Structures are given as C-alpha cells and as structure tokens.
Amino acid sequence: MNALHQKCAVCGRFTTEFNYSVLSCNSCKIFFRRLIVRTVPIKKCFRGERCFEKTPYIFKCTSCRFQKCLYVGMTLPSYLLVLEQNKEQRLAITIDCVRNTHNKRMDSLFNFFVTEMNPNVDDIVELNKITYTKRDEHIRMDFQTWAFHSCVTTIDFMKQFPFVNLLRSTDQMILLKESYVKLGALISATRAYSSKKQCISFPDGTDCLPKTQWTVPKISPNLENRIRCRVIDKLRELNIQNDEFYLLSVLLFCNPAITNLSENGQLLLTSYQKMYSSALLYYCLLTYQKSGPSRFSELLGLFTLLGQHYDDIIHYYVLMQLNQSEVELKKLVKDGIEAAYKS
C-alpha cells in the first residue's frame, strides 16, 4: 500500500508517521506522550468503554482513546527507560521521583489525618483527591486510627504514579486492593529498619497489632512475632539501601501478574514494570559491579517474603474472627485483608 494511504492504528486518520512502535498520526503521538506522564486520573468512560471499537470514534473520550493506544501496541518512549544512552541521568530522575512521592506520603502520615469517618476501599479509590487535615498534638491515635490512616496514605501514594491513573477503573481497583496492605508493610518495615527498631510499629510507637481483650492469649506468639519482625529481619539481612527500597516499592504494585486484570491492564503494567526493573538492575550493576545480577535477584526475592507476611496477616485476622475478638477494624483495613480471598 502507498505510504500516503496508510492509516493511524489508533484513530484511522491517514498518516506516514511511525511513533512508539506503531503506525500513528502526530495527534495520537502527542496524546499518548502527554498521558503516560500525567498523575491526574483520567475521566471514566460512561459509554461502556466502547468509544473506539467502531467508527465514528468519540475522540473526546480520553480513557477509550488511551486504551486503543495500548491495544494496538504503543510502547513507552525511550526517554522513560533506563537505556544505554541515558542510563545514569534516567536512573537519577526515576529514583528522585519515587523519593519525593514517598516523602509526601510520610508527611501525610506523620502530620495529618483524614476526616472521612469509615470509608471502604471503593470510596477512597474513587476520590480524585484525598483531603488531609493538619493533626494537632492532642489528637489521640490508637491502633484502629493508625491502621486506617496508613492504608489511606498508601493508596494515595500509589495513585500518584501515572500507570495507576491510566488503568481502567476496574483494573485500578483490582491493583490497589491487591497491593496496599503489602506495600504498607514494606514501607513500615523499612521505616523501622532505618530507625534501628526490631519490630514494625506506627510512627508514635503504637504496636502494629491490636490489643485484644483476652487474658490468656488465643493467638500464637510466634505468629505475632513473625508479623512484627520477619520483614525487618530480612531487610537487615539484605542491608537494603534507600534507593533500592524506593524502586522495589513501585515494582511491588507494578505487577501485570495480578489476577483478573484486563489484557490492556497487563500490557500497561508490563511496560512500566520494565521501566522500574531496568532502573533497579542498572542501580545494582552500578553499585555492586559483578555482584549486581545476584543482588538484583536477592532484592526481588523480598516479594516472596512479603507474600508470606500478607498470608500471616490474613491468618491472624481469621483467628481474631474465630475467637470472637472485640477488636473492630475499619472498613478500609478489612478490605485490604479480605481482598486475598474475595478476588
């Protein structure tokens, strides 16, 4: 076919350009480039997500147009990836971006609180912006309040990354539900490790497990100690560095293998997983030289331990229910735990 008669794979306009691995017009190239770096959620499609299935396409639907970009095979541009020609600069930018986002989460966790009374995960995820209120020193924070606030700030942290906001609403919900308890555990354990503490706790020292009403313990102390200490012990064994933690924290939830994701959701997460994993690998090669590949594997092995930690939390939660504990968890905390056996 004559080049003049070829059509953009996304919108069908005539074009001779090839952008992001796909035959695509200049308009769709600019559209894709703008979206892959935005941190503001895309407006949901209210037409059943079929605006680009057949002509005439509805170009005003940002969500469907972006999904079509993914479907036809558009890939992340080289300037977002840690490649041979831009390695050190791109690595520094990537780490700085994650570090700054973590610092914002820490400020929200330590100095603010959320006024919503008892929302569930759907309520929090659907908020375009979470509103925080400055916390006075006299405000009392107990286990229930800290656990809830930690979950809110963790979800908010995840939603600051472009790939989360680019997912379809159903995929976004699946990703966040599957990940925020594990990510919160990694962040809390790293904070404890950096502070040279032996156990996971909340910022004011409140235990990460609730106080129960039982005079005689009904849950194994070994299980409780695993929840409090095992992840920190592994971090200490690895002697994990801050930059490694930053990259791992994003890789933890940038996971295309999560069950029930759509094909487009898997494609998007695969692209960003490649971006962050290549950054971590290059960091390891730069820092540890010949030992870089083995260090990279050791760090990724932490995800297996976090899965076991999550299983322990679920086990603990089930035992609390079986033993009729009087501890009442907030909906958001329960949703994160119950996601494992409701998906």
Curated annotation (Swiss-Prot):
Specify the NR LBD domain's residue ranges. Answer: 101-339
Note whether Transcription regulation occurs among the keywords: yes
Which molecular function terms from Gene Ontology are attached? DNA-binding transcription factor activity; sequence-specific DNA binding; zinc ion binding
SUPFAM superfamilies found in the cross-reference section:
Glucocorticoid receptor-like (DNA-binding domain), Nuclear receptor ligand-binding domain
Which PROSITE patterns does the record cross-reference, listed alphabetically?
A: NR_LBD (PS51843), NUCLEAR_REC_DBD_2 (PS51030)
Renumbered zinc finger spans (NR C4-type): 8-28, 45-64
Q: Know the name of this protein?
A: Nuclear hormone receptor family member nhr-167
Q: Which organism is it from?
A: Caenorhabditis elegans
Lineage here is: Eukaryota, Metazoa, Ecdysozoa, Nematoda, Chromadorea
